[in-house]
């Protein structure tokens, strides 16, 4: 039964047919094993108009009974992130996706409670400052995979370039267990990149896109 339920996404699992079929199916839906991966992105179109993803997220976290290992958040997740931080001590993977609205204060409080975190993805989450990565480096010593995509601005259809800023690179260089790193639209320059490489001896995969302050000799970085 659990094998079948694993094939459903979170919204279908909680508010779809399985939870209403019979008592045994209802009980199975509440099994913590099914809630090790919680996804707030609301992929089930047929439920999006009637289901509060915020309520679903907190209920999913409750069902996980401390067993949640992976969490996907989108849009305003301040309350959900704090709720997760208090109830997911085993979390290993955190994804805050696409214009995710989370304050620096909330993120700082939450990240301190994820000491086992191995993967962090921040995609167009611009409400936290770069200093937060120093906190990540300290709070998550086992972090192995980091992806940070900035929401790059534009003016009259011309992409704006970021001024040189290596503060994020200096913090990332303290994440000594990193295996993969993806940085898009960052302000680091060659010196910042060198600092990361020197500080992350286990780095196996590096993906740096649209970081126009990095100059590769013999290559036009803007072309």
Regions flagged by a language model, labelled:
Residues 1-223:
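The conserved beta-strand core of Leucine-Rich Repeat
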């Amino acid at each position: 039964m659990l094998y079948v339920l694993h094939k459903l996404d979170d919204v279908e699992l909680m508010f779809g047919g399985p939870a209403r079929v019979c008592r045994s199916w209802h009980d199975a839906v509440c099994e913590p094993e099914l809630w090790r991966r919680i996804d707030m992105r609301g992929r089930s179109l047929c439920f999006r108009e009637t289901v509060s993803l915020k309520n679903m997220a907190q209920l999913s976290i409750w069902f996980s009974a401390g067993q949640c290992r992976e969490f996907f958040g989108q849009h305003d997740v301040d309350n959900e992130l704090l709720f997760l931080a208090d109830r997911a001590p085993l979390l290993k993977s955190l994804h805050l996706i696409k214009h995710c609205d989370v304050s620096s204060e909330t993120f700082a409080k939450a990240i301190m409670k994820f000491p086992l975190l191995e993967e962090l993805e921040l995609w167009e989450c611009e409400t936290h400052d770069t200093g937060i990565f120093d906190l990540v480096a300290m709070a998550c010593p086992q972090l192995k995979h980091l992806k940070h995509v900035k929401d790059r601005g534009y003016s009259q259809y011309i992409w704006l370039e970021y001024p040189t800023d290596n503060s994020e690179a200096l913090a990332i260089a303290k994440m000594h267990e990193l295996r993969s790193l993806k940085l898009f639209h960052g302000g680091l320059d060659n010196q910042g990149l060198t600092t990361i490489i020197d500080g992350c001896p286990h780095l196996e995969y590096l993906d740096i896109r649209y970081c126009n302050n990095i100059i590769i000799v013999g290559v036009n970085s803007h072309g």
